[in-house]
Curated annotation (Swiss-Prot):
Keywords: ATP-binding, Cell inner membrane, Cell membrane, Membrane, Nucleotide-binding, Repeat, Sugar transport, Translocase, Transport. Part of the ABC transporter complex RbsABC involved in ribose import. Responsible for energy coupling to the transport system. The gene is rbsA. The lineage of its organism: Bacteria, Pseudomonadati, Pseudomonadota, Alphaproteobacteria, Rhodobacterales. It comes from the Bacteria. GO terms for cellular component: plasma membrane. It comes from Ruegeria sp. (strain TM1040). Disulfide bonds: none annotated. This is Ribose import ATP-binding protein RbsA.
């Protein structure tokens, strides 16, 4: 990382009607550094990045690029200035090749009617030689999400990008894919490219970034070298207060109930998982840990009758249970909250109230089957208050909400059927630390009210901080259980990687 400043922002303001999104923000980016941006949802991060990329125009303030004042009227202008933006949502044309996607980016930035396709293809191959072994002739839809993200980065680099903005780039990546991305980021920084890295994940910020700037309520708070501060310092700056109680208090061992909410025996499904047996007790939050692809989500879906040919036996509150499909599961009070919030968890273009009632619309319908808006609003209002949902009106589309509040709507939809058992897959993915603390409190409250809670997460600190027990899954089988003082990242990773079979305190519970 060099000391010279490539991008400098001074006293930037931006309002949307009466709402002040940016309030005199300052920011500087050095050449060849990886600079993290941290802040809760609504802190102003996205607004600032959209201004840097020319998507939005500031109301006042100054932007300097290489010391020269500039205006960035559009994303095309940003590209010509060497600014690239890889959004969290992939923006590629799936039915054309990698090379054609890059050609389109080049066309948008070119003033010429004639494109140097051979030159662009040569440049693309040169860039991919650095990034990965992606074949430019392959259709984008045939690539994994991680490789599609690399194509987005390649688009920027083929346009001689000097500043690269990455917005939550690991949200859909496996751990191995994320590590590849981090190596590429460092390689680009070593070549003099400056990266702005937006993430809610403190581990990623502290492992891969040089500096971090914190924003809160539309204001710039501080910039620090990551080597000189701690994650707790960043969180404190983000929220303006201590979050010592990020995780609510767990059950005391002597208070643990022996009453089983759920019992699973010998659950199997083809090649996905085998002979899975476990139990969940009243008032308990149970965690599922394991590497990506180990079968965690598939087991949860198997219990909820969302998978195909599943065999095995289930008991709910001591009664045998046979489920033919997910509707049977819902009717029995067992629900599954998908890790893909925007794909399966909520309907972004529908109202908050309609989302909440979507799982069982007959609850808000008349005898003739017509939805009663009054009932729908009443249900959404009751559950919204329970979950501390922050919104304008319940008729607003879910797309208008922050990630944390979208997740609360998805959870309210689950609660609308009065579930006895809730499986939550990556429940805090893409939400800020303040929203995480609220979701953790909600889950603990639900457990104390008698619901069975199973949390699937790739974040080990989350599982350790929230759950009373953690089951570890390796290649479709339960490899062990950890609880109490044995619930450590080291023990979980040993079991998840298959280097240790559970024994004693770190073993599969006797069934």
């Amino acid at each position: 990382m060099t000391g010279d400043v490539i991008l400098q922002i001074s006293n930037l303001t931006k309002s949307f009607g009466p709402v002040k999104a940016l309030k005199g923000v300052d920011f500087e980016l050095r050449r060849g550094e990886i600079h993290a941006i941290a802040g809760e949802n609504g802190a102003g991060k996205s607004t600032l990045m959209n201004i840097i990329d020319g998507i939005l125009q500031p109301d006042s303030g100054e932007i300097r690029l290489d010391g020269t004042p500039v205006e960035i009227p559009s994303p095309a202008a940003a590209q010509k200035m060497g600014i690239g933006f890889v959004h969290q949502e992939i923006a590629l044309c799936p039915d054309v090749s990698v090379a054609e996607n890059i050609f389109m980016a080049a066309t948008n930035s070119s003033r010429s009617f004639l494109m140097d396709y051979k030159g662009i293809e040569a440049k693309a191959r040169e860039v991919f030689a650095q990034l990965s072994s992606i074949d430019p002739s392959v259709l984008v839809r045939d690539l994994s999400i991680s490789n599609q993200q690399l194509v987005e980065i390649a688009k920027a680099l083929t346009l001689d990008c000097r500043v690269l903005i990455l917005d939550e780039p690991t949200a859909a990546l496996t751990e191995a894919e994320a590590q590849v991305l981090f190596k590429i980021m460092r390689r680009l920084a070593d070549q003099g490219i400056s990266l702005i890295y937006i993430s809610h994940r403190m581990v990623e910020i502290f492992d891969n970034c040089d500096r971090v700037s914190v924003f809160r309520d539309g204001r710039y708070v501080t910039t620090q070298d990551v080597a000189k501060i701690t994650p707790a310092d960043v969180v404190r700056a983000m929220v303006g207060r201590e979050i010592g109680d990020l995780y609510p208090e767990k059950q005391r061992p002597e208070a643990c109930s022996t009453t089983e909410v759920l019992r699973v025996e010998n659950l199997c499904e083809a090649e996905r998982f085998h002979d899975v047996s476990f139990s969940l007790h009243k008032g308990e939050i149970l965690g599922f840990a394991g590497l990506i692809g180990a079968g965690r989500s598939e087991i949860a879906k198997g219990v909820c009758a969302l998978e195909g040919q599943v065999t095995g036996r289930l008991w709910l509150n001591g009664e045998p249970l046979a489920l033919r499909d997910y509707q049977d599961s819902i009717d029995a009070g067992i629900v599954y909250l998908s890790e893909d919030r925007k794909g399966d968890g909520v309907f972004l273009d529908m109202s908050i109230a309609s989302n909440v009632s979507a799982l069982k619309v007959e609850q808000v319908a008349s005898a003739l089957g017509l939805i009663q808006p009054g009932r729908e609003i009443e249900q959404a209002d009751r559950l919204g208050r329970k979950l501390n949902l922050k919104c304008g009106t319940l008729q607003d589309p879910v797309s208008s909400l922050s990630g944390g509040n979208q997740q609360k709507v998805a959870l309210a939809k689950m609660l609308s059927v009065n579930p006895r058992l809730i499986f939550l897959d990556e429940p805090t993915r893409g939400v800020d630390v303040g929203a995480k603390a609220e979701i953790y409190r909600i889950l603990r409250d639900l457990a104390e009210e008698g619901a069975g809670i199973v949390v699937i997460s790739s974040e080990l600190p989350e599982l350790i901080g929230l759950c009373d027990r953690v089951l570890v899954i390796h290649e479709g089988c339960l490899s062990g259980e950890v609880s109490g003082p044995d619930m450590t990242e080291e023990n979980i990773m040993h079991l998840a990687s298959g280097t240790q079979q559970g024994t004693g305190a770190a073993s599969v519970a006797a069934q």
